[in-house]
Amino acid sequence: MQELSIAFGGREAVRNVSFEIAPGQSLGLVGESGSGKSATSLAVLRLLPAEASVSGRIRFTAPGATPVDLLALPERDMRRRRGSDMAMIFQEPMTALNPVMRVGSQIAEAVRAHQPGLDRKSVELLVLDAMHEVALPEPERRMRDYPHQFSGGQRQRILIAMAIVNRPRLLIADEPTTALDVTVQAQILALLKTLRQAHGLSMLFISHDLAVVAQACDQPGDQIAVMQQGHVVEQAATLDLFHTPKHPYTKKLLASAPTMATDRAQRLASV
């Protein structure tokens, strides 16, 4: 991504954001609500509202292919890449699924959109493989269930299955653990790590929670970028950012989170 800027109605929401995600690498994008994190991720998939004004370059390179600027692609080509070369796990697993469609049909819909030549049996096998891979119990039976019959953590696994079923190279996870309790949150983060390692996925992980981002971006080469008011104010390797933060905003973010060693009488830093 090179100097991405996004404006809505003449008001700039993202300004000159640049970063790179290498194959197999995870980049955490962290910042407070309204800092431009989600707008940046939606720009990658070109899912911003029609009134958004977008400039800059977003170069994507598939294995063995020539780099392409996603912002310059015709919409037809972008539709082909969206969901196959790159996919997104959206926020709010409790509401992101269609409540009147069986979950297996929703995953199958993603397969048919990008592999239209497959017969019904082949599609079903891919759906079952994806459900197995995200550790959903009894997928042969549960693929015929509706979203309301699953817990919040299981619904998040279904959304992840929909995202990975076509084997994308880039996975965008936008606050994938926000609505989950800490135990299920840890399970989802462990699952994402397993999928990264199994498929060599690159990942853009978005959160307002530095602790969650630290868990999602804990492999060698992983980095964290801190956003404030539409700018990336600091980007560094995960350990470097936590041990030696450079920007005042990053320091305040870290200081605002309590630790086991924090004195109960000590006031936390405000951001």
Name every feature range the model reports, one short phrase each.
Residues 165-169:
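A short, proline-enriched helix->beta-strand linker immediately N-terminal to the Walker B motif
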Residues 67, 137-143, 235-271:
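Short catalytic/signature loops enriched in Gly
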Residues 121-141, 254-255:
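Conserved ABC ATPase "signature" region
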Residues 186-199, 211-214, 218:
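Helical segment within the ABC ATPase nucleotide-binding domain
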Residues 65-87, 105, 113, 240-245:
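ABC ATPase NBD coupling module
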